[in-house]
Amino acid sequence: MNILSVEVSHISSHGVWLLTQTEEMFMSYADFPWFKNQPIQAILNVEEPSPNHFYWPEIDVDLTVEMINHPKHFPLQAIAASEFH
């Protein structure tokens, strides 16, 4: 695995930018709520275990380029811990 093949290039109040070898992609917190309110280090710790597949081990999130580029095709949303009661 090439650790330089993917990196988080920016974190803002609106979302996270992910830089790959071929493109930069934006993940809004509205579409990717798992990243909101996470420690910066957990968001920065991203791996690419296989081409176009990204994994954040500290928050146990797996995403593909397709999911990031077309989040409406994958409507599964995170459930806040408070909703499990």
Role assignments for model-derived ranges:
Residues M1-H85:
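Motif-centric detector for short Cys/His coordination patterns
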